Amino acid sequence: MKFIDEITLNVKAGKGGNGMIAFRREAHVDRGGPSGGDGGNGGNIYFVGDLGKNTLLHLYLQKSIVGNNGVNGGRKNLYGAAGEDKFIKVPVGTVVYEGQKVIADIVEEKPYLIAKGGRGGRGNTKFKTAKNKAPRISENGLPGESKKLTLVLKVLADVGFVGKPSAGKSTLLSVISNAKPTIADYDFTTLVPQLGLVKYFDNSFVVADLPGLIKGAHQGKGLGIRFLKHIERCKVIANVIDFGDENKNPLQDYQEIRNELKLYNLNLEEKDEVIVANKKDQECFEKKLEEFSKHYPNKKIIAISALKQENLDKLKEALWQSVKNTKDIVFELSEDEEVFINFEADFNVVHLGEGQYLVEGPKIHHFYQRIPLNTHDNLMRFNLILKKMGVWDELIKQGIQIGDSVKIYDYEFVWGNE
């Protein structure tokens, strides 16, 4: 299956159902009152974490998700049914962005609300008052939330294996875990992150073999920055270094890898680290390890041979101790800024010339969507709201005359005395 770890996706929750204008017209019911029911709420869209998924391919092909609309209200005060919620499975470890804001970090197998359905409109029964016992007033259902999202899969593993190509990461993964990665004697055998479960006595933890890094990876060289992001989620970095090749310099390899991690994200520098000195079965190993240890006497270094399966229990113990003592990494959700609604400034009046005026603005648009302008009572309610907001005062201030035209989205009327 193709590995897709970053996609853009449009989501639109369901629209609320419209409220109904209706009156009781039944035999033996004198002066039947309003009986229009409310519309149902639009369906929400949820993302659900799924440990069985490891790619965003299914959503990459889908491109967009549209929620279910609420049903319109009916006669006899019948409420419209709410739109059925949609639950979309995504891999655990997926971070959901709207622009630069993190709106969800999918770290558990549970639903996360992504887009909320629109509220259903009220039917005319809800507008009955002592003064107006037969209202011809209703509301449209509101649109559901619409968002353009970026989904980024950051592999959810406790330990991330990093290192140069052909350092032996895939072989190591295959001998300490249940994973069966591709193993070959050439660079970039691992093309996508490979996960494996490591058991240590009664404990277990997840390791990820990440594609080999080369100098300039943070700028996209090799398999580059695309896979560096997967290390962000790992609690512990296991830096696998080849100490068994006469032509390789473990000290230089280590410094280059650390530098790439530092240049990509300074926080990676602060992660707990275990240096895995691989290929201890080779003749040059001890000499290279001694030289390396002189430069880094305080580093946690575990000497192993993945090929000969030597010293693996000691490595498992070191990794487990690091995992156990490190907190889970969760991406903080962006806090919504507090919004203060100022009705006086929430519209704009534009004089187009030749007796034509345009009124627009977010709050104007909200009420325009909410109130169906199909009855006298609804029109009166809409006009009263505009008057209270100060729209009429602004039109008069700009010099509107009787007979001039006022356009509010698709609604147009002629200015009169009232």
Curated annotation (Swiss-Prot):
<dbReference type="GO" id="GO:0003924">
    <property type="term" value="F:GTPase activity"/>
</dbReference>
<dbReference type="InterPro" id="IPR031167">
    <property type="entry name" value="G_OBG"/>
</dbReference>
<dbReference type="InterPro" id="IPR027417">
    <property type="entry name" value="P-loop_NTPase"/>
</dbReference>
<keyword id="KW-0479">Metal-binding</keyword>
<dbReference type="InterPro" id="IPR005225">
    <property type="entry name" value="Small_GTP-bd"/>
</dbReference>
<dbReference type="InterPro" id="IPR006169">
    <property type="entry name" value="GTP1_OBG_dom"/>
</dbReference>
<comment type="subunit">
    <text>Monomer.</text>
</comment>
<dbReference type="InterPro" id="IPR036726">
    <property type="entry name" value="GTP1_OBG_dom_sf"/>
</dbReference>
<feature type="domain" description="OBG-type G">
    <location>
        <begin position="157"/>
        <end position="324"/>
    </location>
</feature>
<feature type="binding site">
    <location>
        <begin position="278"/>
        <end position="281"/>
    </location>
    <ligand>
        <name>GTP</name>
    </ligand>
</feature>
<feature type="binding site">
    <location>
        <begin position="209"/>
        <end position="212"/>
    </location>
    <ligand>
        <name>GTP</name>
    </ligand>
</feature>
<keyword id="KW-0378">Hydrolase</keyword>
<feature type="binding site">
    <location>
        <position position="170"/>
    </location>
    <ligand>
        <name>Mg(2+)</name>
    </ligand>
</feature>
<dbReference type="Pfam" id="PF01018">
    <property type="entry name" value="GTP1_OBG"/>
</dbReference>
<feature type="domain" description="Obg">
    <location>
        <begin position="1"/>
        <end position="156"/>
    </location>
</feature>
<dbReference type="Pfam" id="PF01926">
    <property type="entry name" value="MMR_HSR1"/>
</dbReference>
<keyword id="KW-0342">GTP-binding</keyword>
<protein>
    <recommendedName>
        <fullName>GTPase Obg</fullName>
        <ecNumber>3.6.5.-</ecNumber>
    </recommendedName>
</protein>
<dbReference type="InterPro" id="IPR014100">
    <property type="entry name" value="GTP-bd_Obg/CgtA"/>
</dbReference>
<dbReference type="InterPro" id="IPR036346">
    <property type="entry name" value="GTP-bd_prot_GTP1/OBG_C_sf"/>
</dbReference>
<dbReference type="InterPro" id="IPR006074">
    <property type="entry name" value="GTP1-OBG_CS"/>
</dbReference>
<dbReference type="GO" id="GO:0005525">
    <property type="term" value="F:GTP binding"/>
</dbReference>
<dbReference type="GO" id="GO:0042254">
    <property type="term" value="P:ribosome biogenesis"/>
</dbReference>
<keyword id="KW-0963">Cytoplasm</keyword>
<feature type="binding site">
    <location>
        <begin position="163"/>
        <end position="170"/>
    </location>
    <ligand>
        <name>GTP</name>
    </ligand>
</feature>
<dbReference type="InterPro" id="IPR045086">
    <property type="entry name" value="OBG_GTPase"/>
</dbReference>
<comment type="function">
    <text>An essential GTPase which binds GTP, GDP and possibly (p)ppGpp with moderate affinity, with high nucleotide exchange rates and a fairly low GTP hydrolysis rate. Plays a role in control of the cell cycle, stress response, ribosome biogenesis and in those bacteria that undergo differentiation, in morphogenesis control.</text>
</comment>
<keyword id="KW-0547">Nucleotide-binding</keyword>
<dbReference type="Pfam" id="PF09269">
    <property type="entry name" value="DUF1967"/>
</dbReference>
<dbReference type="InterPro" id="IPR015349">
    <property type="entry name" value="OCT_dom"/>
</dbReference>
<dbReference type="GO" id="GO:0000287">
    <property type="term" value="F:magnesium ion binding"/>
</dbReference>
<dbReference type="InterPro" id="IPR006073">
    <property type="entry name" value="GTP-bd"/>
</dbReference>
<feature type="binding site">
    <location>
        <begin position="188"/>
        <end position="192"/>
    </location>
    <ligand>
        <name>GTP</name>
    </ligand>
</feature>
<keyword id="KW-0460">Magnesium</keyword>
<dbReference type="GO" id="GO:0005737">
    <property type="term" value="C:cytoplasm"/>
</dbReference>
<feature type="domain" description="OCT">
    <location>
        <begin position="339"/>
        <end position="417"/>
    </location>
</feature>
<feature type="binding site">
    <location>
        <position position="190"/>
    </location>
    <ligand>
        <name>Mg(2+)</name>
    </ligand>
</feature>
<comment type="similarity">
    <text>Belongs to the TRAFAC class OBG-HflX-like GTPase superfamily. OBG GTPase family.</text>
</comment>
<feature type="binding site">
    <location>
        <begin position="305"/>
        <end position="307"/>
    </location>
    <ligand>
        <name>GTP</name>
    </ligand>
</feature>
